[in-house]
Design a protein with these regions (language model features):
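A conserved acidic beta->alpha catalytic loop
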Residues: 22, 38-47, 63
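Short, flexible, basic/aromatic active-site loop/helix in glycosyltransferases
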Residues: 132-171
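N-terminal hydrophobic signal-anchor/signal peptide
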Residues: 275-308, 343-348, 396-526
Length: 526
């Protein structure tokens, strides 16, 4: 057995289906076994995949064992001279495996090989090549300095941004999405460390490879599609916790105790700061309208009080303790009433907006008339303090909905500007599918070989110009219309903003993902 391919799957059956078809094509003529370890998926992966891939060795776990442990399960079964650890949401070009194996033959000191990766839109994934996460490197990444100085050898060392992504290079760390390694090297350094549940296991493995005297190489002569990339959202608390917990484990394992303790303290402080900033950012992003409402209400009420005390009723001290309590009571009550009527829970309903504000204002005015006579001079303050924010908040909400509607409308219209890259037979199948799902309204036509019964808009080499000419926003690539290699090369030169989806001959789905930070989407072919 020359090659064993190990894939860990968790709830991405449609992506794995496309992956397996591409892997089978890439391994033609090579003595290969494919082992899939499923970490207790709940999406029906077993019943969907097993009938279509009879030669694949599936292992179905009863629990989510984690990435490292699942890979080790596959490794225990692997018989190949070389091992390829591969993510399920990838597509390989036809010559990828052969090129990688040939590269190993050129240098017997290569310990492991990573590869150039792009996302579903053809954008280079910078995690394809990385440096070791030293304390300084981790902090630069944590606080965003790597993003501010993307070409700096110092600040952007984590992603080795100073090295060209189109040239082969020796690197420190390979991405776990694609690692090819000789079985003899694994016998020498050991398997994945199962203490790493998610993140860090590839860093640890890469470190041990170098420590044993081998070299890690980034291979740019072939490019694969990795749909999700680092799919966990980088601003989420879960990502911050998992990533830097992995860094802590890495430091404890590979640094001496005294130095490790100091580094871990720094990392813990950095994690807390990053988590706090992330929480504030997410809170503001999620509750921007309520925050604006609070600011508007406070500003208008206090502005009204200031105006009234200086120009209308100068003899009244509106900032006395009792009056301040009354005013702030009305402010708080106004906010509570607005929230109670689901102002923020149903923020897309303009009728709900008016209803919540009107009811809140009426209730406050009713309460005002129940106030003692000796503070009736607050009438003007409360009246303007209620009506003015009501008007301002309504205008802001109307503008917010207007902008949101426009964005949604544009996205909907863009999705309909679709071209299908396929031969005539496959084009008809895809077109019928889109008609059933209501997505065929603006399918402009087919890209492929000339056919008198179904003349194409052009061939795949003309695709960039056709996209610009017709303002295409979505392309469905069918593998039988062109090779995976040609498709991957094409998406890398398409204009920005084009959404790509992929369909492999024989598969039952169309998959795609707009960027590395978004979950993928799919269409099922029935």
């Amino acid at each position: 057995m020359h090659l064993s391919i190990i894939i860990v799957n968790y709830n991405v059956k449609y992506f794995l289906e496309q992956c397996l078809y591409s892997v089978q094509k890439a391994c033609e003529g090579i003595d290969t076994e494919i082992i899939v370890i499923d970490n207790n998926s709940t999406d029906g992966s077993k019943f969907f995949l097993e009938p279509s891939f009879l030669k694949v060795n599936f292992i179905w776990n009863n629990v989510n064992a984690g990435f490292a442990k699942a890979n080790n399960q596959g490794l225990a079964l692997a018989k190949g001279k070389y091992i390829l650890f591969l993510n399920p949401d990838t597509i390989l070009p036809e010559d990828c495996i052969k090129k990688c194996l040939h590269f190993f033959n050129l240098n017997n000191k290569i310990g492991a090989l990573g590869i150039r990766m792009v996302d579903g839109s053809g954008n280079f994934l910078k995690e394809s090549k990385r440096g070791f996460p030293s304390p300084a490197t981790s902090l630069f990444k944590l606080f965003g300095l790597a993003s501010l100085f993307p070409r700096s050898k110092t600040f952007a060392h984590y992603y080795l941004a100073h090295l060209s992504n189109t040239q082969n290079n020796e690197v420190d760390v390979l991405a776990g999405a694609f690692i090819m390694i000789p079985k003899t090297v694994l016998n020498d350094i050991g398997n994945f460390d199962e203490r790493f549940f998610m993140y860090g296991e590839d860093i640890d493995l890469s470190f041990r490879i170098q420590k044993a005297g081998y070299k890690n190489y980034y291979f740019a002569d072939s490019t694969i599609v990795h749909f999700k990339g680092e799919s966990t959202k980088k601003e989420s608390h879960k990502y911050v916790f998992l990533f830097y917990s992995a860094m802590n484990l890495f430091v404890k394992k590979h640094y001496d105790a005294r130095k490790a303790g100091f580094i871990i303290i720094i990392l813990q402080i950095a994690i807390l700061l990053r988590a706090a900033l992330s929480a504030i950012k997410n809170l503001f992003k999620k509750h921007i309208l309520p925050i604006l409402d609070v600011c508007i209400i406070l500003t208008t009420f206090l502005g009204t009080v200031f105006f009234w005390s200086n120009y209308i009723k100068r003899e009244v001290n509106y900032f006395s303790n009792i009056l301040c309590i009354v005013i702030y009571f009305f402010i708080a009550l106004f906010l509570l009433l607005t929230y109670y009527w689901w102002e923020y829970n149903k923020r897309d309903n303009p009728i709900q907006l008016i209803q919540s504000k009107v009811i809140a204002a009426l209730v406050l005015l009713a309460i005002y008339f129940l106030l003692p006579q000796n503070i009736s001079f607050l009438k003007g303050v409360l009246l303007f303090g209620i009506l003015l924010p009501f008007v301002l908040m309504s205008i802001i909400k109307w503008l917010f909905n207007k902008v949101k509607y426009a964005e949604t409308k544009n996205k909907t219209e863009e999705k309909q500007q679709t071209i299908i890259v396929a031969e005539e037979k496959e084009f008809i199948i895809i077109l019928n599918l889109l008609q059933k799902t209501g997505l065929s309204k603006n399918v402009l036509g087919r890209i492929g070989n000339w056919n008198e019964t179904s003349p194409p808009l052009g061939n795949i080499k003309q695709l960039p110009e056709i996209v610009k000419k017709y303002m295409v926003k979505e392309i469905i690539f069918c593998e039988n219309g062109s090779s995976f290699k040609e498709i991957i090369n094409t998406i890398s030169i398409l204009p920005q903003g084009v959404r790509n989806k992929f369909h492999t001959a024989g598969s039952n789905s169309i998959v795609g993902s707009d960027s590395k930070n978004l979950n993928g989407d799919y269409i099922i072919i029935v």
